[in-house]
Amino acid sequence: MIESSEVFDAVRRGYNEFEAASNSEILDYFSSIDGDAVAGHASHIKGILFEQEYVDLLSAQGVEAQIFEATNHPVTDVAIMDGDNIVQEVQLKATDSSSYISAAIEENPDVGIVATSEVAASFDGDMVIDSGIEDAALEQAVSETVLEEAVNPVSPLSVIGWMFGLPF
C-alpha cells in the first residue's frame, strides 16, 4: 500500500513551489484547482510517485538505483548504479496504455522501459520490464491523497471523468 506521505513527497519533488509546503498547503492548492487541470496534475504526480516507488522497490531487493534530480531528465528517469557508476538508465512509464509504451519504444529503441504491471504484461521480450507496481494503485493513492477534494463522486467533474475514462 502506498502511504499518503509518499504522495506528498512526490508533489514536493514535482512542484518547486511546494518544496517546503505543509500537507495542508498542498491540499488547499489541489482543492482549488480548475477541473480541466486535474488529469494533468494527476498524471504528473503519478509519474513521480512511480519513480519513487520503483527505486524503493529496487532498494528493498538490494539493487542500488537513483532518480535523476530533474523531473524532466531527458529520455530516462532512473539510473541503476554500481557504486558511483551508472550501469543502466531506464525510462519509467506509469500507464495502462500499450500504445503509449509502443510509442516510447519507437522513439528510443535502445532504452529499456519499466512499466506498471497492467501494461507490461502485454509485451514480450526484454524491452519492457514489469515493475511489480500497479498503475491502479498509483492512481488510487494520488486521487485519495491530494485530489479527493478536487474530485469527489458527486461533483460534475467526476461525471465528466467517467464519460472520458478518467480514473476519478
Which sequence ranges carry the predicted segments?
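Short, glycine/alanine-rich hydrophobic alpha-helices that insert into or span membranes
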Residues: 153-168
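Helix N-terminus capping/helix-initiation residues
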Residues: 3, 22, 97, 116-117, ...
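Extended, hydrophilic extramembrane loops/domains of integral membrane proteins
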Residues: 107-153
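Catalytic centers of nucleases
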Residues: 26-29, 36-106
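Interdomain/boundary linker segments immediately adjacent to catalytic/signaling cores
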Residues: 1-46
